[in-house]
Regions:
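Hydrophobic alpha-helical connector segments
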Residues: 66, 80-109, 162-166, 186-189
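Amphipathic alpha-helical packing segments from all-alpha helical-bundle domains
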Residues: 73-77, 123-150, 160-167, 171, ...
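Short hydrophobic clusters on alpha-helical segments that form packing/core surfaces
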Residues: 17, 21-29, 100, 170
């Protein structure tokens, strides 16, 4: 059965409103921090009413979790998609690390939410952050697991530990250099690849 055009227009209008709220929340949480940012700040920037905000989100934290899940999830998806194009484990690891670094430098608001603002905020936010990190770490671990039998560098590495080490080190390096300029994304990615995918 076809959906009436009036319903389609209404759904599109609601989605545009929700998107404005998500974009405003991302900008505010990244620039001011979660604690300082209020729902009023978000709705003012989004140019919507508070009631519009609460149509989509139960609370400020619910909004933060949704933004982190959507925007952080999109970033991780880009990383894993590019990594999958590599012809071998070295190429896939290098592509994944490099894409993560570039995406974070190109989308610093998302990086700030994923790497800084979400840490220790609440159980719910931590669960989202850990799920996103696990997707990246699990992909790295799988590459290491497959490389152990034919690559001496990875032969003695625990895949799960190596995957988490990559995510931790890469995230920390990106977080540091986003707030302490002095290195570009390509140089940072190259340095990290020398360590983890020589």
């Amino acid at each position: 059965m076809a959906v009436p055009s009036a319903q389609l227009r209404r759904d599109a209008r609601l989605e545009r409103r929700r998107r404005r709220i998500v974009e405003a929340a991302l900008a505010k949480f990244a620039s001011r921090g979660y604690t300082v940012t209020s729902v009023d700040d978000v709705v003012t920037r989004a140019r919507v009413s508070k009631s519009a905000f609460y149509e989509f989100f139960e609370s400020k934290e619910h909004c933060f979790r949704a933004v982190l899940h959507e925007e952080g999830g999109a970033l991780i998806h880009e990383v894993l998609t590019e990594a999958a194009t590599g012809h071998d484990h070295h190429a896939r690891l290098r592509l994944g690390i490099s894409r993560f670094v570039r995406e974070c430098f190109e989308r610093p608001d998302v990086a700030r939410l994923l790497i800084v603002e979400s840490v220790g905020l609440s159980e719910g936010v931590e669960a989202v952050r850990h799920e996103l990190q696990a997707r990246f770490a699990d992909a790295v671990a799988e590459e290491v697991r497959n490389a152990m039998t034919h690559d001496a560098f990875y032969a003695d590495k625990d895949p799960a530990v190596f995957g988490r080490a990559v995510v931790g080190a890469v995230s920390d390096a990106v977080g540091y250099f986003l707030t302490h300029p002095g290195v570009d994304a390509e140089s940072l990615a190259a340095s990290l690849c020398v360590i983890f995918a020589p």
